[in-house]
Amino acid sequence: MLDINFIEENQKDVEKRLNHRGNDFSKDLKFVVEKNKRRKEILVEVEKLKATKNQLSKEIGFLIRDQKNGEIEQIKNKIVQMDVQIVELDEELKIVVKEMNDVLAGIPNLPDESVVVGADENDNVEVRKSSHPNLSTQAEPHWEIATKLQLVDFELGPKLSGSRFLVYTGLGSKLVRVIADILLTRHTNHGYKEFFLPVIVNAEAMYGTGQLPKFEEDAYKTGDQYLIPTAEVPLTNIHANEIIDGNKLPLNYTSFTQCFRQEAGSAGRDTKGMIRLHQFNKVELVKFAKPEESMNELEKLVIDAEAILKLFDLPYRVIQLCTGDMGFSSLKTYDLEVWFPSQNKYREISSCSNCGDFQARNMMARYKDENNKTQYVHTLNGSGLAIDRLIAAIMENYWDGEKLNLPPVLQPYFNNQKFIK
């Protein structure tokens, strides 16, 4: 969440920058500032009462010495009344802080000043692109290719689990396993530490990365725990309530997990194929960095995700999201989009974000700087990559109408076979 003191000191500027996201947060900002003012007032009142109590307690000592019992009782009654007032103020403080934090939790991160102001995806800016995409009018959709080659069973998934589920079969299953290994090997060879994580987390972890309370309707819940929508959640929460040695920063983590999303609000979109699933496979990248280094680490993160698309020689582009298209916790985001010939357009395959200290404040993830001062760490995350979408893109870009030609990087895993037919 945002720093309430920063909001209080820069309310107009914060309001302006948040409005660039396309929503009016003025009422929320006014509410949290008022609650914070009352919070401070309560703390002052409590401190005054405690100071008066201490002074009266000292006076009782003198009165006992002078045997002034009548005055002693009067002072004791005053102290009892003050204790009641302190309890009442403490209870009010809890309510005020909860009300303030509940609203703060619904306010998104401030877009960085370098982010282009825009309303939606139409205002995003292309940063660079790779080779020219395949513009063939004969391109086949990946779900037809997958069915022909018996790599994916699109009927068995719904039979077992419902819509937006699928089953990889035979060489399709091997593709998932092999690609996950290739991705993890590349990232671990470039300084990322690998984790094999639980896919069920507690509410605190979801709150820490900003999935709660904003996106609860999109999460799968089991009891009081949640299935992860992305490995960003457990990876980033590794350092919740910790103080990291600043000399160890940046920290680079990676993990391959299955992810689970309700896809609330996606009715009618991408109902066929492997683009939008309730259960999907993804390799995630997470970084912890010093504030002054986080933007540079974001550029490195994009390069690390981009390297996978180069490895598979797929047409892609990098775009910078405008203010109106960025995620809730992000202050700056780049998307990597891969070319889908059958749709004649680029589709997102990775989103790389710098969240600044937004998540760290929720999680109390901090570090000691060179002056031994405790500061909030900056967190970054990105897909490296979404495996189901990567497989779909490989199918569409390497299909020649009769067989699926395998990218050179895959061939050693398939007995140097050059294609699947």
Language model segments and positions:
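N-terminal alpha-helical targeting/anchoring segments
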Residues: M1-P133, T147, L151, E155
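TRNA-recognition modules of translation machinery and tRNA-sensing kinases, especially anticodon-binding
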Residues: S26, K129-K421
